[in-house]
Protein backbone atom coordinates (compact mmCIF):
# COMPACT_ATOMS: atom_id res chain seq x y z
CA UNK A 1 0.00 0.00 0.00
CA UNK A 2 1.30 3.45 -0.87
CA UNK A 3 0.11 6.96 -0.14
CA UNK A 4 0.24 10.41 -1.67
CA UNK A 5 -0.64 13.64 0.10
CA UNK A 6 -1.20 16.97 -1.61
CA UNK A 7 -1.50 19.86 0.83
CA UNK A 8 -3.06 23.31 0.70
CA UNK A 9 -4.97 22.95 -2.57
CA UNK A 10 -6.93 26.14 -3.22
CA UNK A 11 -10.20 24.25 -3.53
CA UNK A 12 -13.25 23.83 -1.32
CA UNK A 13 -13.20 20.46 0.50
CA UNK A 14 -16.93 19.90 -0.04
CA UNK A 15 -16.52 20.21 -3.80
CA UNK A 16 -13.47 17.94 -3.82
CA UNK A 17 -15.23 15.27 -1.73
CA UNK A 18 -17.88 14.82 -4.42
CA UNK A 19 -15.17 13.69 -6.83
CA UNK A 20 -13.24 11.70 -4.22
CA UNK A 21 -16.28 9.49 -3.53
CA UNK A 22 -16.56 8.64 -7.23
CA UNK A 23 -13.07 7.14 -7.55
CA UNK A 24 -12.89 5.28 -4.25
CA UNK A 25 -12.60 1.54 -4.84
CA UNK A 26 -11.93 1.90 -8.58
CA UNK A 27 -8.97 0.61 -10.52
CA UNK A 28 -6.31 3.37 -10.59
CA UNK A 29 -6.03 3.40 -14.38
CA UNK A 30 -9.82 3.57 -14.80
CA UNK A 31 -10.07 6.28 -12.12
CA UNK A 32 -7.48 8.49 -13.84
CA UNK A 33 -9.21 8.01 -17.20
CA UNK A 34 -12.61 8.99 -15.79
CA UNK A 35 -11.17 11.99 -13.92
CA UNK A 36 -9.63 13.25 -17.14
CA UNK A 37 -13.09 13.91 -18.59
CA UNK A 38 -14.65 15.49 -15.50
CA UNK A 39 -15.14 19.25 -15.77
CA UNK A 40 -14.41 19.92 -12.08
CA UNK A 41 -11.27 21.66 -10.87
CA UNK A 42 -10.71 19.04 -8.17
CA UNK A 43 -10.60 16.17 -10.67
CA UNK A 44 -7.21 17.31 -11.93
CA UNK A 45 -5.74 17.43 -8.40
CA UNK A 46 -7.14 14.03 -7.42
CA UNK A 47 -5.81 12.48 -10.66
CA UNK A 48 -2.36 13.88 -9.86
CA UNK A 49 -2.56 12.45 -6.34
CA UNK A 50 -3.54 9.00 -7.66
CA UNK A 51 -0.70 8.93 -10.18
CA UNK A 52 1.72 10.08 -7.46
CA UNK A 53 0.55 7.32 -5.09
CA UNK A 54 0.99 4.71 -7.84
CA UNK A 55 4.52 5.97 -8.53
CA UNK A 56 5.38 6.07 -4.80
CA UNK A 57 4.60 2.37 -4.51
CA UNK A 58 6.39 1.45 -7.72
CA UNK A 59 3.26 -0.15 -9.14
CA UNK A 60 1.66 -0.12 -12.56
CA UNK A 61 -1.60 1.80 -12.74
CA UNK A 62 -3.59 -1.20 -13.98
CA UNK A 63 -2.62 -3.46 -11.08
CA UNK A 64 -3.74 -1.29 -8.14
CA UNK A 65 -7.04 -0.01 -6.80
CA UNK A 66 -7.78 3.27 -5.02
CA UNK A 67 -8.24 2.03 -1.48
CA UNK A 68 -9.20 5.39 -0.02
CA UNK A 69 -9.38 8.97 -1.20
CA UNK A 70 -9.80 11.46 1.62
CA UNK A 71 -10.23 15.22 1.42
CA UNK A 72 -9.67 17.20 4.61
CA UNK A 73 -10.22 20.87 5.27
CA UNK A 74 -7.06 22.97 5.55
CA UNK A 75 -6.55 26.60 6.54
CA UNK A 76 -9.04 29.16 5.26
CA UNK A 77 -7.71 32.35 3.69
CA UNK A 78 -9.75 35.32 4.86
CA UNK A 79 -10.09 38.48 2.81
CA UNK A 80 -12.30 41.53 3.12
CA UNK A 81 -14.47 43.23 0.53
CA UNK A 82 -15.46 46.85 1.06
CA UNK A 83 -19.21 47.37 1.32
CA UNK A 84 -21.54 50.30 1.60
CA UNK A 85 -21.29 52.91 4.37
CA UNK A 86 -17.76 52.02 5.38
CA UNK A 87 -18.50 48.42 6.32
CA UNK A 88 -16.76 45.31 5.01
CA UNK A 89 -17.78 41.72 4.42
CA UNK A 90 -15.58 38.69 4.79
CA UNK A 91 -14.54 36.52 1.84
CA UNK A 92 -13.56 32.96 2.76
CA UNK A 93 -11.14 31.16 0.45
CA UNK A 94 -11.00 27.54 1.66
CA UNK A 95 -8.09 25.18 1.03
CA UNK A 96 -7.92 21.41 1.38
CA UNK A 97 -5.56 18.46 1.81
CA UNK A 98 -6.01 15.41 -0.45
CA UNK A 99 -4.80 11.99 0.75
CA UNK A 100 -4.93 9.03 -1.63
CA UNK A 101 -4.05 5.45 -0.69
CA UNK A 102 -3.64 2.75 -3.34
CA UNK A 103 -3.24 -0.97 -2.73
CA UNK A 104 -2.44 -3.96 -4.87
CA UNK A 105 -5.59 -5.47 -6.33
CA UNK A 106 -6.44 -8.86 -4.90
CA UNK A 107 -7.02 -11.63 -7.42
CA UNK A 108 -10.31 -13.32 -6.66
CA UNK A 109 -10.31 -17.08 -7.06
CA UNK A 110 -13.39 -18.27 -8.84
CA UNK A 111 -14.85 -21.17 -6.93
CA UNK A 112 -18.07 -22.88 -7.75
CA UNK A 113 -20.69 -21.90 -5.30
CA UNK A 114 -23.38 -24.42 -4.59
CA UNK A 115 -26.76 -22.94 -4.01
CA UNK A 116 -29.17 -24.97 -1.94
CA UNK A 117 -32.58 -25.35 -3.51
CA UNK A 118 -35.46 -24.14 -1.46
CA UNK A 119 -38.00 -26.79 -0.64
CA UNK A 120 -41.52 -25.54 -0.87
CA UNK A 121 -44.52 -27.34 0.49
CA UNK A 122 -47.89 -26.86 -1.08
CA UNK A 123 -50.86 -26.45 1.18
CA UNK A 124 -54.26 -27.85 0.37
CA UNK A 125 -56.75 -25.09 -0.41
CA UNK A 126 -59.05 -24.12 2.43
CA UNK A 127 -62.49 -25.67 2.41
CA UNK A 128 -65.43 -23.38 1.90
CA UNK A 129 -67.89 -23.33 4.72
CA UNK A 130 -71.56 -22.93 3.98
CA UNK A 131 -73.67 -20.71 6.11
CA UNK A 132 -76.49 -22.43 8.01
CA UNK A 133 -78.35 -19.27 8.93
CA UNK A 134 -81.90 -19.06 7.71
CA UNK A 135 -83.24 -15.84 6.40
CA UNK A 136 -85.96 -14.39 8.54
CA UNK A 137 -88.94 -13.01 6.70
CA UNK A 138 -91.06 -10.30 8.23
CA UNK A 139 -94.76 -10.77 7.95
CA UNK A 140 -96.82 -7.78 7.11
CA UNK A 141 -99.86 -7.40 9.29
From Swiss-Prot:
GO cellular component, one term: cytosolic large ribosomal subunit
Classification via InterPro entries: Ribosomal_uL22, Ribosomal_uL22_bac/chlpt-type, Ribosomal_uL22_bac/org-type, Ribosomal_uL22_CS, Ribosomal_uL22_sf
Bias type Low complexity, positions: 117-134
Region (Disordered): 108-141
Keyword hit for RNA-binding: yes
Superkingdom to which the source organism belongs: Bacteria
GO biological process: translation
GO molecular function terms attached to this record: rRNA binding; structural constituent of ribosome
Swiss-Prot/TrEMBL keywords: Ribonucleoprotein, Ribosomal protein, RNA-binding, rRNA-binding
Protein role: This protein binds specifically to 23S rRNA; its binding is stimulated by other ribosomal proteins, e.g. L4, L17, and L20. It is important during the early stages of 50S assembly. It makes multiple contacts with different domains of the 23S rRNA in the assembled 50S subunit and ribosome.
Subunit details: Part of the 50S ribosomal subunit.
Family: Belongs to the universal ribosomal protein uL22 family.
PANTHER family noted in UniProt: CHLOROPLAST 50S RIBOSOMAL PROTEIN L22-RELATED (PTHR13501), LARGE RIBOSOMAL SUBUNIT PROTEIN UL22M (PTHR13501:SF8)
Name recorded for this polypeptide: Large ribosomal subunit protein uL22
Organism: Campylobacter jejuni subsp. jejuni serotype O:2 (strain ATCC 700819 / NCTC 11168)
Amino acid sequence: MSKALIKFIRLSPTKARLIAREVQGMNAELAMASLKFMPNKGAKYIANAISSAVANGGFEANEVIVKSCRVDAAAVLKRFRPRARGSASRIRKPTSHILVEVAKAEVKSEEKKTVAKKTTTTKAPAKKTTSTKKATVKKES
